[in-house]
């Protein structure tokens, strides 16, 4: 008999002081067994989504984990998904959005963790931009995290991030933070698109499955061009996590799993992901594992071979349980 799963909404005031952050919790519909005994979760998994998407795209992965005993939650960042007042604001972030997003992630963790016993293990799963947020988050609030899965990450050279940040902030001053620069966007996500030969769309780089690409394009909550304020935030993030100091502030005893496709341009087809692995090891993180999936692009949770990824992540979490 299939487990009945329910979703519930959560909302709170963003650390920008104005936006309402919208989130989702996936959990079993029943909190007690047939004999009346409470149904205790094996752990909580908080999903930190990527750029120009929203957390409900992770529904299949979340349900997979709930069926295996976990509670799953996630929120739409400022400028994303259902956390915007209207769709014209998608992709609009302030230039100081880094700290806001990190603290909003922590706010959701505080809210959801309070619902369960203190001993319930808490995992963070960050994908793409969410992987950069997660890495910066661990440097600030990593204590008490049972483990982190860093998915679809990369390692931008620090000088490149700083140059991009300088340009984005210059445009913020001249045009305002909500201005959208096709030139800056071409330097950013456009660089990923150019790495895919014989591409049919500008977002073929996210997945080898055309149906996933088409669904992304058709989703009104996906694909918005980042404002120059958004790019200032993004390059602020990539610049911070490229530093040794950031990795050294991470908890050394929390296990980390790095996963990515070996055809993912965000991770330089594995090269950048290996640099992150080496960075974590050099910083003294005791348990770091890395797995690259042959032939997969950026969204490994949506690739035709995603079942292997789901199983690998769940098995890793099971081993990380105290």
Tell me what each language-model feature is.
Residues 93-114:
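Alpha/beta-hydrolase active-site loop
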Residues 258-260:
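Short beta-strand/loop motif that positions the catalytic acidic residue
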Residues 42-53, 128-129, 262-263:
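Active-site glycine-rich loops that stabilize anionic/oxyanionic intermediates
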Residues 116-128:
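Alpha/beta-hydrolase fold nucleophile elbow
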Residues 57-88:
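Conserved alpha/beta-hydrolase
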Residues 134-221:
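Alpha/beta-hydrolase-fold enzymes
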Residues 1-35:
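N-terminal cap/lid segment of alpha/beta-hydrolase-fold proteins
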Residues 283, 287-322:
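Catalytic active-site module of serine/aspartate enzymes centered on a nucleophile-bearing elbow/loop
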């Amino acid at each position: 008999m299939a487990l009945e799963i329910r979703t519930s909404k959560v909302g709170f005031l963003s650390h920008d002081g104005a936006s309402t952050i919208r989130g989702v919790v996936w959990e079993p519909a029943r909190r007690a067994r047939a004999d009346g005994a409470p149904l205790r979760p094996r752990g909580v998994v908080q999903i930190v989504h990527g750029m120009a998407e929203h957390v409900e795209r992770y529904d299949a992965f979340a349900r997979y984990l709930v069926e295996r005993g976990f509670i799953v939650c996630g929120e739409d960042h400022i400028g994303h998904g259902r956390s915007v007042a209207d769709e014209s604001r998608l992709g609009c972030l302030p230039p100081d959005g880094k700290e806001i997003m990190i603290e909003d992630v922590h706010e959701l963790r505080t809210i959801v963790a309070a619902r369960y016993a203190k001993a319930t293990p808490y995992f963070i799963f960050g994908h793409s931009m969410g992987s950069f947020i997660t890495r910066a988050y661990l440097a600030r609030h990593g204590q008490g995290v049972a483990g982190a899965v860093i998915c679809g990450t990369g390692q931008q050279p620090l000088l490149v991030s700083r140059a991009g940040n300088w340009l984005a902030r210059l445009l913020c001053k001249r045009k305002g933070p909500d201005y959208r620069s096709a030139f800056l966007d071409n330097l950013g996500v456009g660089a990923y698109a150019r790495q895919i030969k014989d591409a049919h769309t500008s977002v073929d780089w996210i997945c080898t499955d055309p149906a996933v690409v088409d669904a992304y394009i058709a989703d009104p909550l996906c694909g918005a061009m980042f404002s120059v304020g958004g790019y200032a935030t993004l390059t602020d993030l990539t610049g911070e996590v490229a530093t040794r100091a950031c990795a050294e502030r991470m908890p050394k005893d929390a296990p980390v799993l790095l996963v990515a496709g070996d055809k993912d341009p965000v991770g330089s087809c594995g090269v950048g992901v290996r640099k992150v692995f080496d960075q974590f090891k050099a910083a003294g993180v005791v348990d770091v594992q890395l797995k690259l999936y042959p032939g997969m692009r950026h969204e490994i949770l949506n690739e035709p071979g995603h079942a292997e990824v789901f199983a690998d992540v769940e098995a890793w979490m099971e081993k990380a349980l105290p």
